[in-house]
Amino acid sequence: MAYVLTETAAGYALLKASDKKIHKSSSLIEDLNTADKVAEQFKIHRFEKFQSAANALEEANAVIEGRVSDSLKKMLEDAKSDKKATLIVSEAKLGNAINKLGLNFSVVSDAASLDLHRAIREFLPELLPGLDDSMLKQMSLGLAHSIGRHKLKFSADKVDTMIVQAIALLDDLDKELNTYAMRCKEWYGWHFPELAKMIVDSVAYARIILTMGVRSNASETDLSEILPEELEEQVKSAAEVSMGTEITAIDLENIRALAEQIVDFAAYREQLSNYLSSRMKAIAPNLTALVGELVGARLIAHAGSLTSLAKAPASTIQILGAEKALFRALKTKHDTPKYGLLYHASLVGQASGKNKGKIARVLAAKAAVALRYDSLAEERDDSGDFGLEVRAKVESRLSALEGRDLRTTSKVVREQPKVDITEARAYNADADAPTAEVDSDDESDTEEIDTKKEKKEKKEKKEKKDKKRKREDDDEEEEDKKSKKEKKEKKEKKEKKEKKEKKDKKDKKSKKEKK
């Protein structure tokens, strides 16, 4: 007796085959090319209808994952007989799961069974009474959409893929902007070299090129929208006595095209930064309040998704982004890194060198809690109050370690202060003055402090050297042990070989003497 288990959008169908060895006969399967032949070969034995669309999705996911659902198990238990029967299934994982149930079925799932299922599905409406072709197609389409939505887990408000792409694009834009700005300054520098020393901001530099053109137009050009009044006068006066060479109209046209690219890229970068900030506040408000938009976005991008990052422990979040250093340290048996991407967080930046590792550990622990709150909480809270509360605790811990009061942040997402474009500072030699005479008591105190520092540094250097020497000695001892072991093994092999050869010679000699 042979049964065929077919999963449809309407329910599970268990078909009984007239030939129990149909799955072994390729000629019989090839003959199933018409509805009459399929109907003649298979009869409906049992049909377990799905209760709703949600139930259909649940059952379909169970089949995809290779699990036997309760309804399928019940149907198979009702269908089993005393005699052992063959059950043909299309999914190998599902077949293995049915085998583990211990039912009286010999489960088959191979290439021939796939061809058999293909023929059955083509003429399925003829086998299932009460289901026409159009209804079955409509059910299949609805189930396909449900499975697609389930796999994508799409939500318009919570798409961390947007963050991953936005932060990657932001990094690429920064690299491109730096490259373009460098080329622009080098190119226009042949015509007006003094301008690069006075204007540090690349976007302002590009806007001056677009507004002014050649340096001879400086006196007639209004740069008040770009530069402060004092700096504008300095640029105009420098243009009159510039040492740069003259450039043609074609040169200026190409330089202007590059300057336009820089201005456009800078405007788009600002727009993208605002977009990333709004996305981070919508998706992970508490993480944003704790570590900031950029660090939070880089953590999510590195982990792949917000859910993956939320599932990670605090120790993983702490060193996320420092995987190369971690594996190198483990390989060489050195100290493992204390922080990865969290190093760029403002709270870690406020800590002194000796406390950075401690604060990174505390921040990682709090970030893990904030991430789980953002990703897995039953009730959404977009205000980020929990993140601000946790940040205050980290700040109090930092102030306790540093032994000084730190400025508390009412707003974590700080607005960037407006940068005044000023002339680059030059060294003023006239401001130099001879050092004042210091009292002997003060000198002795400073000398004592210096000697203590020198002793401490020498002690630390000595300890580091001792540790390094000890590691090298340990490595040498291990190598010596290995070489001795190898020599011993070679010697034993040689002795065994010699003994065997002697034994063989004796045997040959004894055989000759007998003859």
Curated annotation (Swiss-Prot):
Keyword Manganese attached: no
Summary of the function given for this chain in its UniProt record: Required for pre-18S rRNA processing. May bind microtubules.
Matches recorded under SUPFAM superfamilies: Nop domain
InterPro entries the UniProt entry points to: Nop56/Nop58, NOP58/56_N, Nop_C, Nop_dom, Nop_dom_sf, NOSIC
Family per similarity comment: Belongs to the NOP5/NOP56 family.
Stretches the record annotates as Disordered: 423-515
Domain Nop: 283-403
UniProt subcellular location: Nucleus, Nucleolus
Gene3D superfamilies: 1.10.287.4070, Nop domain
Single GO BP term: protein localization to nucleolus
Keyword list, A-Z: Nucleus, Ribonucleoprotein, Ribosome biogenesis, rRNA processing
This protein's encoding gene: NOP58
Any one Gene Ontology cellular component term annotated for this protein: nucleolus
Single GO term (MF): snoRNA binding
UniProt name for this protein: Nucleolar protein 58
Statement: the UniProt record of this protein carries the keyword rRNA processing: yes
